[in-house]
Curated annotation (Swiss-Prot):
Name of the molecule in the record: Dense granule protein 2
Organism whose genome encodes this protein: Toxoplasma gondii
Its biological purpose: Major granular component involved in excreted-secreted antigen (ESA) immunity. Possibly acts in conjunction with GRA1.
Location (main, coarse): other
GO CC entries: symbiont-containing vacuole
Residues the record marks as carrying a glycan: N18
Keywords: Glycoprotein, Signal
InterPro entries: Gra2_protein (IPR008118)
Ranges of biased composition (kind: Basic and acidic residues): 43-66
Length: 185
């Protein structure tokens, strides 16, 4: 049981670090804006004054200009990636408990909704909601595991000896019913 809690904690911390890194990248794009500094490989004083003392114009930018992606599209793309990661986390947690799966799925949807606002604040809200949700999922998962370890494996009402809560559910069946939001908005 300790190993499961430890693994869940490592997964949750890794996901939060990833979310905070993405939010930091996004906030840098929003706050700094585009910076266009040409670089020719020569020091500035040699570029301005030629070898014989004549004045030469600055060299044009040799980099190929890439079309800039609007901030809202970048935010939508990052939100979609985060949603898919949380959904994958929900499916992994769902191997242990249906309630934990539903809670993690709700966390993923809330995170997507908050991140869809295309603001740094939205990402911060999503990160905080994901952190709280993952801690809650971890606690529920720990409670489910402790309940399973203390209960008997044979239920009086079941004909084959499995309790209703111990019936295995295939992750493919569960994933088929999860709606994926429309990211084109």
């Amino acid at each position: 049981m300790f190993a499961v809690k430890h693994c869940l904690l490592v997964v949750a911390v890794g996901a939060l670090v990833n979310v905070s890194v993405r939010a930091a990248e996004f906030s840098g794009v929003v706050n700094q804006g585009p910076v266009d500094v040409p670089f020719s490989g020569k020091p500035l004083d040699e570029r301005a004054v030629g070898g014989k003392g004549e004045h030469t114009p600055p060299l044009p930018d040799e980099r190929q200009q890439e079309p800039e992606e609007p901030v809202s599209q970048r935010a939508s793309r990052v939100a979609e990636q985060l949603f898919r990661k949380f959904l994958k986390f929900a499916e992994n947690v769902g191997h242990h408990s249906e309630k934990a799966f539903k809670k993690a799925k709700v966390v993923a949807e809330k995170g997507f909704t908050a991140a869809k606002t295309h603001t740094v604040r939205g990402f911060k809200v999503a990160k905080e909601a994901a952190g709280r949700g993952m801690v809650t999922v971890g606690k529920k998962l720990a409670n489910v595991e402790s309940d399973r370890s203390t209960t008997t494996t044979q239920a009086p009402d079941s004909p084959n000896g499995l309790a209703e809560t111990e019936v295995p559910v295939e992750p493919q069946q569960r994933a088929a019913h999860v709606p994926v939001p429309d990211f084109s908005q």
